A protein has these predicted regions:
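Short, Lys/Arg-rich N-terminal segment immediately upstream of the first membrane anchor
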Residues: 14-25, 439
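N-terminal maturation segment of proteins
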Residues: 25-627
Length: 627
């Protein structure tokens, strides 16, 4: 019995108990206490028994962690049938310093237990699991001990004010009246959650740590917009009405639900946002005048930890910077070659030539009222084509479908060009590729296949949906760990794979792929430039503009993202380079025995792993294939 089967067995057993409880209550009433005792004994056996294996221990830790996060329980989807018991769809997590301290204590104990499993008693997969869990837990411990207040929880890209709204509109299910009522209960918690966030900001303030001024500017504007919405046009209301209109409920019931939500938005949402807005306004003059984390207490050490966590390597900031410079030169040379093949005169920097191409009417959509629908239609067609084109290069394909949607209007001004959301564990929610269509001129047609390869097929959707669906992996390996070095490295590799196997339709499409790769190589330079070499935001923007040809808007959004999310952007290119390096090693050592499908299977079938683990897996596969 695999661990996933074991967990499903436990959940199935719990469901049987639930059904038994309902029948017992119906016929026996007071016998509920007896049934409750049965449930208690069942859960004690599952969660209190001695960990007889590292898989068992990490599964228990993960399940306890999941049930401690109502948002994650909703995201997974598998607990919705048990919502009468967990009531997770009625709740939001409320952060506190006490909870953070408790989590830290748990991590110390966790690390001690994991290290206590002797390698000689573990099988190959368990040794991999141990490496991952130790690496991840050590990073969490250091983050808490030294840098717990170094982040910017209210920022323009993934601020808590945006995340709360997006979670409710995109993840909370509304399939019946109870779930609609749960939605309202959750929205009512906004004020409590934001008040807890305000306490955190005030603790950070005591350390004289503030986000840069431009972050204050963006967040103040976003909060004012969220507060100013009329009830009927509030994103929380729009998606709510859209979903309940599809339910078989009477009009009076729908009207009452909508009225109740309107009252909650006025009494609990807007005041919560206002409290954060007041903090931003009152502390505006204290905003950090610098942009890099070098300016924070022990900032260099903090950045080193961020690089190690995100790249899963021991590269120093200077090494990452130099790799970036080398890659920018290499990619630029290939782009110049293509421009020459297309008949252009290469008489100016590649960035300027790409900027001219970005403004060429041949590659732009008309700015019509239905422009978003047209672009989404074309993206969906590209996804279908990609799904057919990749079939010769993989053994497995996701069961979950992928949909393309526009980035919500309330976040599109500052959101990235595209991003992906994984499907739910129970298969009821598809994978979603979000495309930012705020400025239609920022969607040149020659770059659309690149984004399709990256976010959908064979990029994020292939990897992350397959990971969730892979029942050969333990629960921890499916859900307990993730690193952008692997996920984003794979997505960037997927772009290049698209060129290599002929999924691009012309040289302009290849230029789109190269522009994307140039963009990721730039990240190595500008991220380390900002946080290690003390570059200003403006210097980083100038560098990226000259070398990529991206628009002013795109460059600004990206650079501002790296400032509030230090180190993460370096993981894409570092991950891609490692995957390509390992593929080349396998080709050289296996010769005619090399099969691209086998290589892809090794990279994808073991779940999301650090790059040092991926290298071990490829090396073992090479030796096994030789024999």
């Amino acid at each position: 019995m695999t661990l996933i089967t074991l967990v499903r067995f436990h959940l199935k057993g719990f469901t049987l108990i639930k059904n038994f409880m309902i029948k017992t209550l119906k016929y026996f009433g007071l016998s509920f206490l007896i049934v409750l005792l049965v449930v208690s004994l069942y859960l004690m056996n599952l969660f209190s028994s001695r960990p007889y294996s590292i898989d068992h221990y990490l599964a228990k830790e993960l399940i306890v962690g999941v049930t401690d996060s109502p948002e994650y329980m909703t995201y997974l989807g598998i607990f919705d049938d048990l919502s009468f018991f967990f009531k997770h769809n009625q709740k939001l997590s409320v952060p506190s310093s006490e909870k953070s301290a408790e989590d830290y204590k748990d991590n110390l104990e966790r690390l001690d237990i994991i290290r206590g499993f002797n390698d000689s008693s573990l099988n190959k997969n368990q040794r991999i699991t141990k490496k991952i869990a130790v690496f991840d837990t050590e990073n969490d411990i250091e983050s808490y001990e030294r840098f717990r207040y170094h982040s910017y929880p209210f920022n323009q890209i993934s601020g808590n004010h945006l995340n709360l709204v997006e979670f409710m509109t995109d993840t909370h299910p509304i399939r019946n009246k109870n779930q609609a009522s749960d939605y309202i209960r959750r929205v009512k918690m906004f004020d409590e959650v934001l008040d807890a966030n305000l306490k955190w900001l005030n603790e950070q303030k005591k350390l004289n740590i503030y986000a840069p001024k431009f972050v204050f500017d963006h967040v103040i504007k976003q909060l004012r917009e969220l507060i100013a919405y009329e009830d009927s046009k509030n994103p929380l209301m729009l998606i709510f009405k859209e979903k309940i209109d599809k339910l078989d409920l009477g009009e009076e019931v729908k009207d009452n639900l909508s009225k109740e939500l309107s009252e909650v938005i006025r009494s609990d949402v807007k005041p919560g946002f206002q409290s954060i807005l007041n903090f931003m306004l009152e502390n505006y003059q204290s905003a950090n005048e610098y942009h890099g984390v070098w300016s924070l207490p022990d900032g260099d050490d903090y950045y080193a930890l961020r690089l190690r966590s995100y790249t899963t390597t021991d590269y120093t900031a200077e090494e990452v910077h130099q790799i970036g410079l080398q890659e920018v030169d290499r990619i630029g040379n290939r782009m110049r070659e293509i421009f020459l093949e297309l008949g252009y005169e290469v008489d100016k920097p590649v960035g300027e030539m790409m900027n001219d191409l970005n403004e060429d009417p041949r590659f732009l959509y008309e700015d019509t009222e239905d422009r978003k629908a047209i672009v989404i239609r074309d993206y969906n067609q590209m996804v279908k084509e990609a799904e057919e084109d990749v079939k010769p290069y993989f053994y497995k394909f996701p069961v979950s479908p992928v949909e393309v949607r526009a980035v919500p209007e309330y976040s599109e001004k500052t959101a990235a060009g595209g991003y992906y959301q994984s499907p739910s564990l129970d298969g009821t929610r598809p994978g979603v590729f979000y495309a930012n269509l705020y400025d239609i001129k920022q969607t040149p047609k020659f770059g659309m296949r690149t984004l399709t390869f990256h976010e959908a097929v064979p990029g994020h959707h292939f990897q992350l949906a397959l990971n969730i669906e892979n029942e050969e992996l333990t629960l921890y390996r499916r859900l307990g760990y993730s690193t952008s070095a692997h996920t984003e490295g794979w997505a960037l590799y997927a772009e290049q794979l698209g060129v290599e196997v002929g999924m691009t339709k012309n040289l302009y499409d290849e230029l789109g792929v190269l522009q994307s790769e140039m963009f990721r190589a730039n990240r190595l330079v500008v991220d380390t430039g900002i946080h290690h070499k003390k570059w200003t935001r403006e210097r980083a923007m100038d560098y990226m503009k000259k070398t990529t040809g991206m628009s002013d808007t795109e460059v600004r959004v990206e650079i501002e993202r790296y400032i509030v999310w230090p180190g993460q952007a370096t993981s894409y290119k570092i991950g891609m380079l490692k995957i390509l390096e390992l593929r080349e090693k396998a080709k050289n050592q296996l010769g005619e025995k090399f099969d691209l499908r086998d290589f892809h299977a090794i990279v994808l079938d073991h779940g999301i792993v650090p790059l040092f683990v991926l290298e071990d897996l490829i090396d073992e596969w090479i030796e096994e294939s030789k024999n």
